[in-house]
Design a protein with these regions (language model features):
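Short, solvent-exposed loop/turn segments at secondary-structure boundaries
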Residues: 125-128, 158-163
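Cofactor-binding loop segments of dinucleotide-utilizing enzymes, especially the Rossmann-like FAD-
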Residues: 8, 39, 117-120, 151
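A short small-residue
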Residues: 1-4, 114-115, 149-156
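Short histidine/acidic/glycine/proline-rich micro-motifs that form metal-
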Residues: 10-13, 85-87, 120-124, 154-157
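A charged, well-structured terminal subsegment
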Residues: 134-152, 160, 170, 175-179
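N-terminal beta1-alpha1-beta2 submodule of the flavodoxin-like/Rossmannoid cofactor-binding fold
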Residues: 1-82, 87-103, 163-184
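Short, glycine-/small-residue-rich phosphate/pyrophosphate-handling segment
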Residues: 91-92, 107-147
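Structural signal for conserved beta-strand scaffold positions within catalytic alpha/beta enzyme cores
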Residues: 36-38, 61, 115, 147-150
Length: 184
């Protein structure tokens, strides 16, 4: 299975990146091919809605999104891994998702989607802005929302290491079948 992991944290050893690391390790140990794109560390220009791409052509910006283009088109599973920033996904990951517009026709094919998110609060209510946004994304693209790992109560860098969430991410990666994700 080809997997594209899109991360949004600028902290190399941040909590959501820890989830991504464990997920990728589990997936690769199970024989899957995983490509990773750390949006916060790459140059992806925000979409300006110029419509030059026409939802299927090249984007006017020649930047690191070109790496994603081929990987997302060929991926069987896309994993979105983000910290919550002011009740939403990180701006850098959002910029990547907005640029999906330029390849809209090419990525509206059957795929699996996984969400892994971290946030400092412990209130379930605080999750809802990200979950509402995420719910619509795979639905619109015709993808299957396979599994979610929601990790509340982690704020300080590395605090997730004292929880069960890294193990859950690893086991999710290990449990991937050739057909897709299976619930944990």
């Amino acid at each position: 299975m080809k997997i594209l992991v899109l991360t949004g944290s600028p902290r190399e050893h941040g909590n959501s990146n820890t989830l991504a690391d464990h997920f990728i390790r589990g997936a690769e140990e199970s024989g899957h091919e995983a490509a990773r794109f750390d949006a916060a560390l790459r140059n992806v220009h925000p979409c300006t809605a110029c419509n030059s791409c026409g939802m299927n052509g090249p984007c006017v910006f020649d930047d690191d999104f070109n790496f994603i283009r081929e990987h997302i088109i060929s991926a069987d599973l896309a994993a979105f891994v983000t910290p919550m920033y002011y009740f939403g996904i990180s701006a850098r990951l959002k910029a990547v998702i907005d640029r999906f517009y330029a390849i809209n026709g090419s990525i509206r094919t059957p795929k699996q989607a996984v969400l892994m998110m971290t946030y400092a609060d412990i209130s379930k209510r605080k999750e809802s802005p990200i979950l509402t946004h995420y719910d619509v994304l795979p639905e619109y693209l015709g993808w299957t929302d396979a599994v979610r790992i929601i990790a509340p109560g982690v704020w300080a860098e590395g605090s997730i290491s004292r929880t069960e969430f890294p193990k859950k991410a690893y086991l999710l990666g290990r449990a991937l079948s050739r057909q897709g994700a299976s619930s944990q």
